[in-house]
Regions:
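A short C-terminal boundary segment appended to hydrolase-like catalytic domains
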Residues: 53, 60-146
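Short acidic, glycine-rich surface-loop motifs adjacent to enzyme active sites
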Residues: 1-2
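Conserved beta-sheet core of the metallophosphoesterase superfamily
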Residues: 7-74
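Alpha-helix initiation/capping motif
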Residues: 6-7, 109
Length: 146
């Protein structure tokens, strides 16, 4: 569970962004949120975290090798605008998510109808960990009822 991209990941992302055909690179499978970088209207999301997991972690079957960061994830959003010089990312945001590892393995979008059975401190800590990895490259999206 590496919170930072490897040299290989960084080299590959840089080479992809060097191409005029690539504006966005989305990485996955790190099982933890990894940094987001913006470069000249392009972006790299190195790791989206866990959006689906069957790793154990409930009281009956704890995952001793799974740090809390393996329950973090994000839904990324990008606005792409066509310009005279090609496409450019003109806005970007995210919604932090948290994996409930009890019987449902539900993905909880933090700040969107948070479930009562999950302590608010748990969700807040997850959101802080995610923000530390992706801000300021992405802004946190908020939702209002109604």
């Amino acid at each position: 569970y590496r919170a930072k991209p490897t040299d290989r990941q960084q080299t590959a992302a840089g080479r992809l962004l060097d191409s005029p055909e690539v504006d966005l690179v989305l990485g996955h499978h790190a099982h933890v949120v990894q940094p987001v970088i913006r470069r000249d209207g392009d972006a790299v999301v190195y790791g989206l975290g866990n959006l689906l997991t069957n790793q154990p972690g409930d009281e009956a079957n704890p995952c001793r090798s799974c740090p809390p960061q393996t329950q973090d994830g994000l839904i990324a959003w990008f606005q792409v605008t066509e310009t005279a010089n090609g496409a450019q990312i003109t806005d970007a945001g995210y919604v932090p998510t948290w994996v409930d590892r009890t019987t449902t393995h539900e993905i909880v979008p933090i700040g969107v109808d948070d479930p009562e059975q999950v302590g608010p401190g748990v969700l807040a800590e997850s959101a802080v960990r995610t923000a530390a990895m992706v801000e300021p490259a992405l802004r946190r999206l908020t939702f209002t009822a109604g």
